Amino acid sequence: MNVMINACFYFLDCANVSYAIRCAVSFAYCKPKGTSLQARPPNMPLNGWIPSENEFAWGLPGKTPPFEEGFDPLGFTNLVSLGDFKRYREAEVTHGRVAMLAALGFIVSERFHPLFGLPETEVLAIDALTMVRKEVPFFFEILAITIATAELFRALVGWAPPSFGTVAMGDTLQDDYYPGDIGFDPLGLKPTDMEEFEELEAKELNNGRLAMIGISGMVAQELVDHKPILSWWEDNFGLSF
């Protein structure tokens, strides 16, 4: 229970740090009165996408079989503006990417952890950070700086300066920013063909959604059984790793 509570507070703190960074960066980059930010001309596509309120999810990629028309039985996508939907998609893509890294790291770290003086035996991933901190007292401070740096870069790329007098200051994406596309592609893997780009983005969304469910399930399983996830799979499904 303590692990769950600490995890909840940790992620809440990360969310607050993320919001604070966006606000701070937005204030720092506000233009003086009388000047304007350069905006993308109307109807100019972002990665081949022109928003349309007549299409599912404003026309953003993500519709895959067996739901070729999109899956939203409760109609949530019909209740939000374009700006809000872009922000939700940005959040979904970002959380999905983090979850994919977390799911991979969760499994690998239990049997392969050569750093930080951890024991050579199999360890519980949910206990690994606590063990690391005993060896590296300032580990979480270093981790927080790393996360803040990544969030700072994302805020500089995609988030608009605040509108003074509104409630959601620093919580709006720029008009010419495509959700999730922060321009980080060192290997040049981003397709230039629109159809190929939409296909790969749909795959990323689906894998990210699965990873969010998967990492939640693995954490819950270890909290209940206190057994490394790979060993649990071996004992219950006869899998060998």
Where are these regions (language model features)?
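Active-site or metal-binding loop neighborhoods of secreted/extracellular toxin and effector enzymes
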Residues: 1
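Alpha-helical transmembrane segments and their helix-helix packing motifs
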Residues: 6, 13-241
